[in-house]
Amino acid sequence: MAPEDTNPQSSHRRTRSTSRSRPTTPLRPSSRSSFRSSARGSVYGDNAAFPLNAFEPAFAELADAVADLEANMMHFQLMHESLARFSESFASFLYGLNMNAFCVDFPEGPITESFKRMKLKEEEMQASSQIPSAWRGDPPISTPTAIYPRTDIRILIVKSGGYTWWKRRASWGSG
């Protein structure tokens, strides 16, 4: 066994560090003394009938800590099961959205029926308000307004009833 250092200055130097990376936390009362010192006291005349009785408080504390750990792990298990159920349900929802995207055609712009519905709605609004279209300030449906020579894509801008539609067309014929 190595001799213990009884110099108070050396132990004082060790505990007094000026560059601590994190704050220190005081130890719990049972952790301040080691098992060795408690066993030494019982062996060398602590008036105990059985020397291992000195470990009884430490083992009781260990049993309590293990019971707390078991309860916390049970809570973790419940949380894991809840998250797994949610993840499975959410994955099913995303899969349904993905399959819906494959089964339903989403056009990039309005289709012919959209223009027909808009025209009917506009006629209904005009009939109900009896205001001439020239007074409303809506421009008529325009012709292709932009030509991109490198990509040969033309854009049709349609203003009708407060909505603006952009439609990409790859070919318009001669325009």
Swiss-Prot record:
<comment type="subunit">
    <text>Component of the DASH complex consisting of ASK1, DAD1, DAD2, DAD3, DAD4, DAM1, DUO1, HSK3, SPC19 and SPC34, with a stoichiometry of one copy of each subunit per complex. Multiple DASH complexes oligomerize to form a ring that encircles spindle microtubules and organizes the rod-like NDC80 complexes of the outer kinetochore. DASH complex oligomerization strengthens microtubule attachments. On cytoplasmic microtubules, DASH complexes appear to form patches instead of rings.</text>
</comment>
<keyword id="KW-0158">Chromosome</keyword>
<dbReference type="GO" id="GO:0000776">
    <property type="term" value="C:kinetochore"/>
</dbReference>
<keyword id="KW-0159">Chromosome partition</keyword>
<dbReference type="GO" id="GO:0044732">
    <property type="term" value="C:mitotic spindle pole body"/>
</dbReference>
<dbReference type="GO" id="GO:0005737">
    <property type="term" value="C:cytoplasm"/>
</dbReference>
<dbReference type="GO" id="GO:0051315">
    <property type="term" value="P:attachment of mitotic spindle microtubules to kinetochore"/>
</dbReference>
<comment type="function">
    <text>Component of the DASH complex that connects microtubules with kinetochores and couples microtubule depolymerisation to chromosome movement; it is involved in retrieving kinetochores to the spindle poles before their re-orientation on the spindle in early mitosis and allows microtubule depolymerization to pull chromosomes apart and resist detachment during anaphase.</text>
</comment>
<dbReference type="GO" id="GO:1990758">
    <property type="term" value="P:mitotic sister chromatid biorientation"/>
</dbReference>
<feature type="compositionally biased region" description="Low complexity">
    <location>
        <begin position="20"/>
        <end position="39"/>
    </location>
</feature>
<dbReference type="GO" id="GO:1990976">
    <property type="term" value="P:protein transport along microtubule to mitotic spindle pole body"/>
</dbReference>
<keyword id="KW-0493">Microtubule</keyword>
<dbReference type="GO" id="GO:1990537">
    <property type="term" value="C:mitotic spindle polar microtubule"/>
</dbReference>
<feature type="region of interest" description="Disordered">
    <location>
        <begin position="1"/>
        <end position="39"/>
    </location>
</feature>
<keyword id="KW-0963">Cytoplasm</keyword>
<dbReference type="GO" id="GO:0072686">
    <property type="term" value="C:mitotic spindle"/>
</dbReference>
<keyword id="KW-0539">Nucleus</keyword>
<dbReference type="GO" id="GO:0008608">
    <property type="term" value="P:attachment of spindle microtubules to kinetochore"/>
</dbReference>
<comment type="similarity">
    <text>Belongs to the DASH complex DAM1 family.</text>
</comment>
<keyword id="KW-0137">Centromere</keyword>
<keyword id="KW-0206">Cytoskeleton</keyword>
<dbReference type="Pfam" id="PF08653">
    <property type="entry name" value="DASH_Dam1"/>
</dbReference>
<dbReference type="GO" id="GO:0042729">
    <property type="term" value="C:DASH complex"/>
</dbReference>
<protein>
    <recommendedName>
        <fullName>DASH complex subunit DAM1</fullName>
    </recommendedName>
</protein>
<keyword id="KW-0995">Kinetochore</keyword>
<dbReference type="InterPro" id="IPR013962">
    <property type="entry name" value="DASH_Dam1"/>
</dbReference>
